[in-house]
């Protein structure tokens, strides 16, 4: 819980950036007030996440060219982006990495084939990878219910949207009251 004597942390979890894009009030309740309710959806998501939440390897500090990387449940931070992220999966070759984020739900029926909050969370993971010396041109959202992988390029518009969401999350936390 964030209080006046306990100012907002320096880093926002990528997951909270997702919540902020989805519903700023929910992000405030969960991140600032520290009130997180476990419901049936959360329990099911945790069950589906059990494999990717097991540590399956670390990212090499200086990957060799052509070295295959497949690391599960990797935590990285990027103070310059004010972000921290737990990636379900980092896969790639050499210094080029693709974050893969698992979602329990179905593939949305929209032109992007993904939810805006999910794209922003994934891009936040890409920004964290970049800040740690990896190349990351895009990511993958895996919608478990549909068993579908969706590639998401990290273009300038998505990067700007992601950084704006991070700034908005911190501004909201500094307000000291939940948004309507």
Task: Specify the residue positions occupied by each region the protein language model found.
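Metal-dependent nuclease catalytic cores that hydrolyze phosphodiester bonds in DNA/RNA
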Residues: 1-99, 106, 110, 120
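Metal-dependent nuclease catalytic regions and adjoining charged, substrate-binding loops involved
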Residues: 2-4, 80, 112-113, 128-180
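Short, acidic/hydrophobic/Gly-rich beta-strand patch recurrent on exposed beta strands
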Residues: 99-101, 142
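Short amphipathic alpha-helical face segments that pack within enzyme cores
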Residues: 120-127
């Amino acid at each position: 819980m964030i209080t006046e004597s306990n100012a907002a942390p320096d880093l926002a979890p990528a997951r909270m950036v997702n919540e902020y894009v989805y519903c700023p009030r929910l992000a405030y309740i969960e991140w600032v007030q520290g009130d997180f309710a476990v419901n049936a959806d959360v329990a099911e998501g945790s069950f589906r996440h059990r494999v990717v939440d097991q540590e399956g390897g670390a990212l090499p500090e200086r990957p060799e060219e052509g070295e295959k990387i497949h690391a599960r449940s990797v935590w990285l931070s990027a103070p310059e982006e004010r972000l921290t992220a737990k990636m379900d999966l980092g896969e790639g070759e050499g210094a080029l990495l693709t974050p893969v984020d698992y979602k329990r739900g179905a593939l949305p029926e929209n032109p992007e084939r993904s939810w805006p909050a999910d794209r922003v969370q994934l891009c936040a993971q890409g920004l964290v990878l970049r800040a740690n010396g990896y190349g990351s041109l895009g990511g993958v959202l895996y919608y478990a219910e549909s068993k579908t992988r969706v590639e998401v390029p990290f273009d300038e518009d998505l990067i700007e949207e992601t950084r704006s969401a991070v700034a908005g999350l911190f501004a909201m936390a500094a307000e000291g009251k939940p948004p309507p």
